[in-house]
UniProtKB/Swiss-Prot annotation:
Main location (coarse class): nucleus
Protein name as catalogued: Protein swallow
Lineage: Eukaryota, Metazoa, Ecdysozoa, Arthropoda, Hexapoda
Bias kind Acidic residues: ranges: 79-91
An annotated GO BP: bicoid mRNA localization
Keywords linked to the UniProt accession: Cell cycle, Cell division, Developmental protein, Mitosis, Nucleus, Phosphoprotein
Annotated Low complexity bias: 189-205
Subcellular location: Nucleus
Length: 548
């Protein structure tokens, strides 16, 4: 145990022990050291000394009373201080050997306690120091005194309890939000003054609670009104949102309808442009057409009253050996070969190089191969293109339309007439208008073929016709060169004016085939051939290529 511990009994014990050790004499009563009288606690506690005086104030300065409670004094004090302390005390009290009195009898006027462990010198020395322990003890005593003054039979009010649970008020909380005081509140008869003070406090608290309750009730009512207003505004906004959504859906449907109509109109316009005669050979057809072959239709009989110079197609169909539609390209405004009027019984045809001067001379043929003789008295050039009988201006073109009727009558230019007269050949426009023929382009072999009849009985006059046709062939060759040159000049004139004609387009497309004069059968991709397709008037034409 430390010597500086406050729980150590007292300093007098050490003094007595020191005196005994110095004198060498022992007292018999000190033999019972196991139970010294100094440790016996008096029945009166130390704290009751403060309340011995009836006029004592609980809130007084208890901290300054260092005689009762003070900080511990160090045990190893100076010997001089002890000597001074011995001089102040009577000499009889210090003579332990002569007296039989028990230890501690010299302080009979003062209560002995474990807390009173300091000497008088220590108390006087630290008298000016405020004791924090004493101050804390004084506060505890004051609170205890207040609790003892309040004399109620039931539970005492504690600061931690809310006012609504205080037994003194006996308040009951009703469902409507109001408080009412129980009338059965009972108090002791000997505490009327305290009851009056408490009732005043409770009444003021009750009024305050009523005021707070009223203010809260007003807030609740205002919040309810605000909630109703917000609910109405929410319904209004939701209604507007629904209307906007409906309008958006209707607008979207209208937009889809307009877009569909626009796409349909664009498709109709595209088909109309593709079907127009001005775009027949210039644009690529996007729409599909019905498939047909040359065996789809029966052969029409040739009328006896027809023109003997007209050679119909063998099968009456312009498609030639095609299972995927038309692969032939009709040549528009192709000048026919010059023919000499002979005996109707003896008519022989030959295929010669044709002129592609589309601006000067053209032929006309219908879809069935039978042509009609038309004469135009007008001096200006007339080019008319009429669709096949199975077509209309607004219908889709069929794949059977390999040839288109073209009628062109124009007077011969004076310059070309003079040139032909100088070369010794003269072909009148009437002669061109009276002769008609059917031509189609064989895309497989890259050749231009004129369909004509061939009579075996005319073989006797073959030599005469061969000589005559040779002269006509030479004249047509010169005519072809002239037509190409004239078309080339006209194409330059149209190029300056940024205008293109059908003749210039066909010349650019078929120019290499016409200008080629190579008769080598090995190079068939760049050569234009002239063949004759024999056909008996009374028999059905059978193509040998279909027999494969």
């Amino acid at each position: 145990m430390s010597l500086q511990d406050e729980s150590f009994p007292t300093d007098e014990l050490f003094d007595q022990l020191n005196n005994l050790s110095s004198s060498g004499a022992r007292n018999t009563w000190f033999a019972e050291h196991h139970k010294p009288a100094v440790f016996e606690r008096d029945t009166a506690p130390f704290l009751e000394i403060c309340y011995a005086d009836p006029d004592f104030d609980a809130d007084g300065d208890v901290a300054n009373k260092s005689a009762k409670t003070c900080v511990s004094d160090p045990v190893g004090r100076d010997q001089e201080d002890e000597d001074d302390y011995d001089e102040d005390v009577d000499g009889d009290d210090h003579k332990l050997g002569c007296e039989k009195a028990p230890l501690g009898s010299g302080r009979s006027s003062k209560a002995v306690s474990y807390q009173d462990i300091h000497s008088a010198y220590t108390k006087r020395r630290f008298q000016h120091v405020t004791s924090k322990v004493g101050q804390y003890i004084a506060e505890i005593q004051a609170q205890d005194q207040k609790r003892r003054n309040v004399k109620f039979a039931g539970f005492q009010r504690v600061n931690s309890m809310p006012e609504s649970l205080t037994p003194t008020l006996q308040q009951v909380y009703v469902h409507d939000g109001d408080f009412k005081v129980d009338k059965n509140c009972q108090t002791h008869s000997n505490s009327d003054s305290n009851y009056n003070s408490n009732s005043n406090n409770s009444s003021s608290s009750f009024d305050r609670l009523l005021a707070e309750n009223e203010s809260l009730q007003q807030k609740i009512n205002s919040l309810r009104v605000e909630a109703k207003r917000l609910q109405g505004f929410n319904e209004y906004v939701q209604e507007r949102l629904d209307r906007k959504t409906d309008d958006f859906v209707k607008m979207k449907c209208n937009f889809e309808t307009l877009r569909t109509e626009l796409s349909e109109c664009q498709q109709k316009l595209r088909r109309q442009q593709d079907n127009s005669q001005h775009h027949f050979m210039y644009h690529i057809r996007s729409a599909t057409s019905a498939k047909a072959t040359q065996t789809d239709f029966l052969v029409d009989t040739i009328p006896a009253s027809g023109n003997v110079l007209v050679t119909p197609h063998p099968l009456g169909d312009l498609t030639y050996n095609s299972s995927k539609g038309s692969i032939e390209l009709a040549l528009l405004s192709v000048a026919p070969s010059a023919r000499v009027a002979q005996n109707p019984v003896q008519v022989q045809r030959a295929i010669h190089p044709q002129s592609l001067d589309f601006s000067s001379v053209s032929t006309e043929a219908d879809g069935s191969g039978s042509g009609e003789h038309r004469v135009e008295t007008s001096s200006r050039a007339l080019v008319r293109r009429t669709p096949a009988p199975n077509n209309s201006e607004t219908s889709q073109p069929s794949s059977n339309d390999s040839a288109i009727e073209v009628e062109a009558h124009e007077e011969e230019r004076p310059s070309s007439r003079r040139q032909w007269e100088q070369q010794g050949e003269l072909i009148s426009p009437r002669q061109w208008g009276q002769h008609e023929g059917m031509y189609y382009f064989d895309k497989r072999n890259n050749r231009v073929i004129e369909v004509m009849g061939f009579n075996i009985s005319q073989g006797r006059n073959q030599s005469h016709d061969t000589i005559h046709n040779q002269s006509i062939n030479d004249s047509q060759t010169r005519l072809l060169v002239h037509s190409m040159s004239m078309s080339h000049l006209e194409a330059h004139d149209h190029f300056r004016s940024k205008r293109t004609t059908l003749g210039s387009r066909m010349l650019r497309f078929l120019g290499p085939c016409v200008r080629c004069r190579n008769g080598d059968p090995l190079n068939r991709s760049n050569v234009t051939y002239k063949d004759g397709l024999p056909a008996m008037p009374e028999e059905e034409f059978v193509d040998q290529r279909n027999q494969r």
